[in-house]
Amino acid sequence: MFKYNCLNPIASVGLDLFSGDYEKVEDLGQADAALVRSAAMHELELPDSLLAVARAGAGVNNIPLDKCAEKGIVVFNTPGANANGVKELVFAGMLYASRDIVGGIDWCLANQNDENIAKTAEKQKKNFAGTEISGKKLGVIGLGAIGVLVANAAIHMGMDVYGYDPYISVSAAWNLSRSVKHISNVEDIYRECDYITIHVPLLDSTRKMVNAEAIAMMKPNAIVLNFARDLLVDEEAMVEALAAGKIKKYVSDFPNPTTVGAKGCIVTPHLGASTAESEDNCAIMAVREIRDYMENGNIVHSVNFPDCSMGACTTAGRIGMLHRNVSGMISQYSTTLGDAGMNIAGMTNKSKGDYAYVLIDVDSPVTEEVIQKLENIEGVLKVRKVK
């Protein structure tokens, strides 16, 4: 029996995928796996029983990745599950920034008691006129699941699309429209594009990547959209530029005292993935990742360990071992198994940065004695008898 804990409400359509071999517990200290959305985990005490954390969403800034890795806890996310919901809101942001829709709505509310509002509106509507997005240049920074959807949809809406991502995956490249112009220098996007939308993860290398220097390169009519992470933009520099009329609008999905109410800022309360479909998709993917790891030892969509999969186990036993990515590990655990008289029927070893993971299928049942001997190898973080 596996036990799981939900640190946030998780859509029932996902939780319903757990079989009868899983039990929901209210205490994280009793859990083998945890599902989380936005709950902060950095200060939580992580129990030794915890094997996996699945983030029902893409961002993992609320999860202590290094701490989890050191304790042999695999952290998963659900890339692409909420991509369409975010994509749609990006285009809503473009339209709100291009045409004063909000101003027009506010005007109607302020004049709701005017019996002649229809006639008055015809005279006032020029105050809320804007521009169309068709024919404009859109720069997409980051061509992951969301960025690719935004770029492709913009092509169909008649925009001239420029894409920048030096680390684009093979899958994303295959899915990207051939009409998207590939840019090798992000500064070209800053200088040339009417709309700039950011879709990169928050890393040390991307923190405040849109800074005062980048903003200074932009057109005075530029509109910047941020539906990724607020810390990707130096928002104090952005607000100063907006106040000075150096760019037109900043659209953000991350409200804070700096941007809310500031001139030229359109801010929404983190609505990007707040659709029933996105929440369902994230929950479904998160539960499937947990089940595949708990039942088969397979890692798919981990952010702190390498992806590693051998399908379902068809031999007498399977061992999963998380360890440091150092030389000599393969020979040590191969020798340990050989000394125990166990034949390796199949094995896959993958590494990612400082950490690695190995799945080993064996032709005889896995004993606790063998598990203990593997745990005693220097550099091993966690060993698990999968079958």
Regions found by a protein language model. Give the residues of each.
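An N-terminal-biased, well-structured beta-alpha scaffold segment characteristic
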Residues: 1-78, 211-213, 217, 223, ...
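Hydrophobic Val/Ile/Leu positions in short beta-strands of Rossmann-like dinucleotide-binding domains
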Residues: 4-6, 140, 321
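Rossmann-like adenosine-cofactor binding region
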Residues: 39-44, 166-259, 274
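Phosphate-binding beta-alpha-beta segment of Rossmann-like dinucleotide-binding domains, i.e.
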Residues: 79-137, 298-303
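Oxidoreductase and adenylate-handling cofactor-binding alpha/beta cores
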Residues: 87-106, 152-159, 285-298, 334-338
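Glycine-rich Rossmann-fold phosphate-binding loop(s) that bind the pyrophosphate
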Residues: 136, 143-144
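N-terminal Rossmann-fold NAD(P) dinucleotide-binding loop
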Residues: 147-148
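NAD(P)-dependent dehydrogenase/reductase Rossmann-like domain
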Residues: 250, 260-263, 271-387
